UniProtKB/Swiss-Prot annotation:
The keyword Kinase does not apply. Its main location: cytoplasm. PROSITE patterns: KH_TYPE_1, S1. NCBIfam families: polynuc_phos, PRK11824.1. GO terms for biological process: mRNA catabolic process; RNA processing. It is an enzyme of class 2 (transferase). It is found in: Cytoplasm. The keyword ATP-binding does not apply. Its EC number is 2.7.7.8. It comes from Wigglesworthia glossinidia brevipalpis. This is Polyribonucleotide nucleotidyltransferase. Residues 622-690 form the S1 motif domain. Component of the RNA degradosome, which is a multiprotein complex involved in RNA processing and mRNA degradation.
Amino acid sequence: MLKATIQKFQYGKNIVTIETGMIARQATSAVMVRMDDTSVFVTVVADKKEKLGQKFFPLTVNYQERTYSIGRFPGGFFRREGRPNENEVLVSRLIDRSVRPLFPKNFFNDIQIIATVMSVNPQVNPDIVSIIGASAALSLSGLPFKCPIGSSRIGYIDNKYILNPTTSELIDSKLDMIVSGSSNAVLMVESSSNILQEKNILEAILFGNEQNKIVIENIDKLKKKFKKENLEYDLKSLNNNDIQFVIEDLFFDRIKDSYKIPEKKKRLEKIENIKNDILNNFINNNNTNEEEILYIIQNIERKIVRNRIISGKPRIDGRTEDMVRNLDIHLGILPRTHGSSLFTRGETQALVTTTLGTERDAQNIDDLVGDKIDRFLFHYNFPPYCVGEVGIISSPKRREIGHGKLAKRGMLAVMPDIDKFPYTIRIVSEITESNGSSSMASVCGASLSLMDAGVPISSSVAGIAMGLIKEKDKFVVLTDILGDEDYLGDMDFKVMGTREGVTALQMDIKIEGITSEILQVSLDKAKNARINILNEMDKVIKKPKNEISIFAPRIYKIKINPEKIKDVIGKGGSVIRMLTEKTKSSIEIEDDGTVKVISTDIKNAQCALKKIKDITHEIKINKIYVAKITRISEFGIFACLINNKEGLIHVSKIPYKKFSDINNNFKIGQIISVKVIEIDRYGRIRLSFTGTDKNKNKKFFNKNN
């Protein structure tokens, strides 16, 4: 009989259970993790041998949601899950970024982590459960995974930090932060916040990592219970000191000189030439392979750049550690877009556009933890030309989806409420040049583009990427890092915010030993840089434009009696179809009686609004109206009021002495004045005749029809 090894523990207000040994026994390792009713099954499979010529660590993470987990059928024609949705991509990245730093640099075997969501309590998000599951599965796998990690979601409600807040609690929380880390170090942070101070952000990170120790202790206990032996893997030795000594002796000065070239393109060309010279000299003559040589060159590059920075010398492009690259800002460069900006920071450039749409343009998101409508879209594109390469243009990659979501988090806190600005907003950031921090350039460009579009954001937002060089007890925090400083450094810490506080951050750390002091210095330097950038942005545009673009749709709202909605729509949609065609406007009606008229032409919109008001006008007893005669009969006159409602003037309500013969005194199409005397339970209107002031009445009738 199959028997599982189980570890159960309290984690905040949740009960977490980790089981292994009963399901998917042919995988390298597999665990089922439950947090209350949310269950995620995580497997790890690793190849025994690395692929020939492998030059990087091929870790693949697939987080996949199953709709059966909430008792529903998938949408679409085939009624089964298809390509990964945005949330699946984002959670896959969270898992990857949390565990990747804990593998040896010389481990190149293929590893695949699959996290399958099997049951969901809508109040418990599966993302944290998945990261815990990946940590547990890797710890039980026998792979060279350094140590278990924990992961936690942190909220901030009523000035208190909350561990793993529910979906409902997050609505009132000023913070939504995920912290992953080992018992010694924070490894990954992802957060959005409602303009919190740096002090609160630091406290939340430290609080989260302290809570992570609960998970780590229990994974260690499970590991002792399960007692799986470590697998034998051939960890390639890439440290050939003899060859490195020779390469350094012959090429060190050339490599060092190349890192004095501030322009990225020229520097990369010089380094590429040096690499080719080294490979030509050593591969054929010294019984070495290309991977080993490239690893040695990387070590030399790392040593040169890091020693230069740690000793206080200028960085690759000549800047000091706290300097932001030169900024160049332009607005409205694309005349037919609703808003646009070109934001350039050094050799990183983002062309950002804003498009305004209606509620119909909003994105319907079918989520496991609750369906929602997203009226703010942020798309980030990273074409190959931005780094001077030839590449394949395809659907958005994981990195593009992740960067777009990060930039969106940075902007959310300043976006207007739907009641104040009833538009769906789409921002697109086209990265036209890249040398580090392109996602942060997207945030700055988005803020500028929104203001150019006349979107009433509450404040400007800027983003900055911080880096770290740490050697033993010495460390230097770098402001506005280049691509090479990210690649050769120890940290990538992106911070977004206004002058008042932080709106979002993302942190990936490659080493252990990141102290609270380093985090504090990073946040303080990021604040200074952010304010400097905001000062430059304010010189170009300080507040949103008063008017939206003439090419953007105008949205006009009126409220009608919900019972009149059927009159505006008409039988089979005939009335609303006629209105949209005649006024060249789009009309949206909500159940509460809110009517939106959308048009780029104000005259057309006003015409549509007037017609809707006429249709929904409620006729009142004892009020005098202008009417047009539609029929004449022996017993009276039928007349149409301004809202196309027909009423009867009985002959008894027409002065007999003055109009003894109604056929001779009245004609069809004549404008008359009437008084409403009764509306019966069937809606039939009884009128009395009050006059025939032709000029005045005709003018009034034409004005109102």
